[in-house]
Each structure stands twice: as structure tokens, then as C-alpha cells.
Amino acid sequence: PIAKTFRDFRAFLDALPSANLPPFRRDAVCVLTREQNFDQTMSNGWSAFLLAKQNGFDVRFQYVNETFEKSDLYIVPGLRGACGIFREEYLALLERVKEGATLYISLDDGALSPFESIFGVEVESREARTAPARVKFGNETFILPSPFRLNLRKTHAEVLAAEEDGNPVFIRAKYGKGTVCLLTLPLELDLAGRPGAFHKTSEPEWRRFYRAFAQHVIAKRLVRTGNPLVTLTEHPDAATPERCLCVAVNNSAVPIRPEFEIADGWKLEKELPELAPFSGAPFRLIKK
């Protein structure tokens, strides 16, 4: 099996349309914060990566104490503690939002200030949870454990999802030219420890949470697929702007013939063959 894997990888490299694959497009910055141990940091980052991939976009990672890279979307998963993000770092992110970016934050037991003026909700009280939150989002119910419950009162936010008693847990608000989104539950940390969360058909559509705030970056991709188990990377090359190399990967245990949605003005150079289980194939998009 090892020798076959090496042969298959050699065949994959030989099939690439270019000897040197350009770097792939990254659409968002995932910010890793303080007050998390190694497992928590890895879990939050891993889930953020997978939720992004299943929605058809890619992330780059950076630590919160680094200068924030310019991006249309910032993802801050599983914020913990009072010092998970320092005030000046938080304000620096908000400046990016004022300029037009989108900021998504999910909370573990983290605290943010300012809060109400940014997110459009007021915290009336905070209490320890004795049972997981049952969240109604669209036509699905999502069950998520969390150490605390924030009892929120809406002021100017849009409520995207709420608990069964109406308490908002996922909200969106305008801030300057951009948008802020807040999830008061540790989505990413929980999913990382939930067997089958990303592929079992019995699981709800967890990627819906990321799709709610990432539509603007997803819409900019040249190729998309509705299958969460087929992931894509785009490798634009400034030297040949009329072409874009792409790679599709089948992350399932069965063969898949992927169906793509191609951006206006582009087309497949040739049809992609059926993808074998747990394998990938390169293809090229060309301008019409």
C-alpha cells in the first residue's frame, strides 16, 4: 500500500498542468488567540479550516499578537478569558471592519469590550449552563455545549440563530463599511471533538454557520461545488491571468464525479474525470 501511494502521488504530480503550481488563493485570516492550551488552539484552528474548506474558501493563520494581514474576512474562533485578545488588538481588528472587512468571533468563555455598541446586543446576564444549548438556525436544530449562557437583548443587531426560548446566540451587525458576526457558543472547539461532525449524514449542516458570514468571499471564487466532501484550491498565476490552475480533492470513501459552478466569463478547459476515493486531480479554468 505504501508503494502504491507513492506511485499515485507521482502520477498526480505528472498530471499537473504546470511543473510549478502557484500558491493557492487564501480568502480569509484565522486569528489564533491567547488563553488557549495547545489542544484548544489546534482544535479551534482545525475546525475553522474545515468549515471554510467545506464552504469553498481557504484561510491563512496568524497569531493575535502579529500585525493583522489585510483581508476581506477575519475569523476568531473560540475566544477564551479576559485576555484572549488585548484591547488594542481588538480595536485594530475593528478598524479593518470599519474599512469594509467582515469579522466573525465565536466565544468560549471570552470577554470583549466594547460590546453592545459593536454587536448590537446588550448582555443582561451571564450564567453557567447546566445543559447544552439547543439552537434553531434556519430549518435545523443544532445542539452545542458551552460553559456559559449569555442572556442577550437585541438593540440593533440582526439575529441569525437563537435558542429555543428566543435567546440570541448568532448575530450580525453593520460596523462602519463592514460587518461583525458573533456566535456566543464554542462551535469550533466542540466540533473538533465530535466524531463524524464533518462527514456523517446524521449530523446537521454545521458549515451553515460559516456560510452565513462568508458569502462575499465565496462569491469571488472562480469555481465552487455544493458537495462538502469535495474541496477545491485555486492557484492563480499573475503571468497568465487568462488561466487559473485548480485542484479538486475527493475526501470521501466513494468515487465522485464533481459538479462545479463556474464564475461568469470562465470555463473548464476540459471535463474532470471521476475522482477516486481520497484522491485529487488538477484541472484548469480558462477565460471565455
Question: What residue spans do the PLM features occupy?
Answer:
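Hydrophobic, well-ordered secondary-structure elements that form the walls
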Residues: 28, 59, 246-248
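Short, well-ordered secondary-structure micro-motifs within conserved domains or adaptor modules
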Residues: 68-83
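Aromatic-lined carbohydrate-recognition surfaces of secreted/lumenal glycan-active proteins
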Residues: 24-29, 64, 106-108
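A conserved amphipathic helix/loop scaffold
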Residues: 82-288
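Extracellular/periplasmic catalytic domains that process cell-envelope and extracellular macromolecules
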Residues: 22-25, 68-69, 98, 174-175
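Hydrophobic targeting/anchoring helices
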Residues: 1-47, 53-55, 137, 160-164, ...
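A short, well-structured beta->alpha microelement
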Residues: 48-70
